[in-house]
């Protein structure tokens, strides 16, 4: 059963939920599409952010975060991806911290003014501590993110 655009919009509006849209991931196989230039002359990643940000602006009160967020890899170079800070602020799910290369100290450097909206995602680096060391690994990483947030 195919859902048309009007039905999708009604479902989104009536559900009062949010979602994350893939915008600029660090997956090598996605870069061909996400970094390609669309008919607008911008990178597809930039177009995704512009369209979703416009939707967020239309459906959010002034000063509120948008309910549609973005997946932007923690190791993605924003300039190379053709993206920049966006408004209204929306959550950013950022996989790639830990084993994949980004550190808590990179959070502000990589995400700039958007860093307060970032949900830093890492798992392998924490899970590598094993069952006995898991709680200590989580506590240590939380302390690193708190310290990075003060900087």
Model-derived regions: residue spans:
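Single conserved hydrophobic/aromatic residue that forms the stacking wall/gate
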Residues: 1-12
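Short, conserved active-site loop motifs that form the nucleotide-linked donor/cofactor pocket
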Residues: 8, 68, 118
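Active-site rim beta-loop-alpha module in soluble metabolic enzymes
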Residues: 15-95
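Short, hinge-like loop/turn segments at secondary-structure boundaries
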Residues: 13-15, 37-40, 110-112, 137-138
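Short, well-ordered secondary-structure micro-motifs
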Residues: 9, 31-34, 81-83, 104-105, ...
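C-terminal alpha-helical cap/extension of soluble enzyme domains
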Residues: 88-151
């Amino acid at each position: 059963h195919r859902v048309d655009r009007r039905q999708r919009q009604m479902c989104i509006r009536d559900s009062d939920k949010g979602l994350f849209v893939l915008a600029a991931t660090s997956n090598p196989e996605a870069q061909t599409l996400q970094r390609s230039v669309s008919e607008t002359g911008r990178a597809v990643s930039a177009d995704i952010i512009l369209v979703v940000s416009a939707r967020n602006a239309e459906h959010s009160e002034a000063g509120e975060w948008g309910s549609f967020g973005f997946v932007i890899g923690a190791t993605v170079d924003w300039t190379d991806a053709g993206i920049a800070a966006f408004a209204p602020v929306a959550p950013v799910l950022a996989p790639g911290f830990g084993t994949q290369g980004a550190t808590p100290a990179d959070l502000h450097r990589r995400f700039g003014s958007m860093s307060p909206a970032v949900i830093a995602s890492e798992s392998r680096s924490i899970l590598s501590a094993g069952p006995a060391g898991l709680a200590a690994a989580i506590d240590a990483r939380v302390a690193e993110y708190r310290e990075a947030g003060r900087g």
